[in-house]
């Protein structure tokens, strides 16, 4: 496997704008020190219920669900159809709210992520990229910074250009439109936008969906390098077993309306449950397990 070293240049975004949740009592230049103090829970989910109503009928998706995600992990959420994987991801981002229970992100209620400056705390890569079709590449990447309305245009463009190159795209791509991009380039632009304010937490919804094998491998290599070099905590939803085993340090399995196991990949595969047996030990799972045996991953 090719090892990619990502160059993380000095940021052009003031710390007090970029990261208010991590260390609100620290001055400029100190906000990111909190990442290296000691191990901590980045996401905590406690007694979570998600109930959808359709007329007189109720569908319980999550019931008393508990989960903790520690700093520095790459945790993957897997489960069958209807187990609420993406719903849980959106709840962590504050885009949806549980029926009851608590989700805290970086020590604060996830519901507050909808407020100004959320991009400095959590970055989100949506499944199809979710780029604005009327914006150029550089305008898409810069969008979260422009929404702050606190930085001059030249600083915003400089920060966006840094992230454009950090995800492996050339400066020539800056003025292209989304309609001119390949699927792999769309993913990279969306990733650059998710990272524009250096958030400590990155959420990925099917990051390699729609990519050919070569593009998928290249994108996984990029994600692993960014996770390492930017000291990210990553939460990922994926159905792709190759991506799952290549990136995950832990896997949380959703079944029976809860997390039935949250552990390292080898322990999860050995856990006795019908979904796990079908998902991991079928022909596709066996092929992906070869990758795990070849590349034993550590943080």
Task: Label the predicted regions.
Residues 93:
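Helix-to-loop junction immediately C-terminal to a conserved catalytic motif
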Residues 198:
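Conserved catalytic motifs of ABC-family nucleotide-binding domains
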């Amino acid at each position: 496997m090719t090892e990619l070293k990502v160059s993380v240049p000095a940021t052009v975004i003031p710390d007090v704008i970029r990261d208010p949740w991590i260390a609100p009592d620290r001055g400029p230049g100190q906000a990111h020190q909190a990442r290296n103090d000691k191990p901590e829970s980045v996401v905590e989910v406690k007694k979570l219920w998600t109930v959808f109503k359709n007329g007189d009928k109720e569908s319980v998706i999550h019931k008393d669900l508990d989960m903790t995600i520690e700093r520095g992990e790459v945790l993957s959420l897997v489960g069958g159809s209807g187990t609420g994987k993406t719903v849980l991801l959106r709840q962590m981002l504050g885009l949806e709210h549980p029926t009851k229970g608590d989700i805290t992100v970086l020590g604060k209620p996830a519901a507050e992520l909808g407020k100004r400056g959320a991009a400095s705390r959590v970055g989100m890569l949506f499944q199809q990229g979710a780029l604005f079709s009327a914006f150029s590449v550089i305008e898409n990447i810069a969008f979260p910074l422009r929404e702050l309305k606190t930085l001059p245009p030249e600083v915003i463009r400089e920060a966006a250009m840094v992230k454009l190159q950090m995800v492996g795209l050339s400066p020539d791509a800056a003025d292209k439109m989304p309609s001119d991009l390949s699927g792999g380039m769309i993913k990279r632009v969306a990733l650059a936008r998710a990272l524009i304010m250096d958030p400590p937490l990155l959420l990925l919804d099917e990051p390699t969906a729609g990519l050919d094998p070569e593009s998928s491998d290249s994108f996984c290599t990029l994600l692993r390098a960014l996770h390492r070099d930017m000291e990210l905590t990553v939460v990922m939803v994926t159905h792709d077993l190759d991506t799952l085993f290549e990136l995950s340090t832990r896997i949380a399995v959703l079944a029976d309306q809860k997390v039935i196991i949250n552990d390292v990949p080898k322990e999860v595969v050995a856990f006795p449950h019908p979904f796990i047996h079908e998902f991991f030990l079928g022909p596709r799972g066996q092929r992906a397990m070869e990758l795990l045996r070849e590349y034993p991953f550590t943080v």
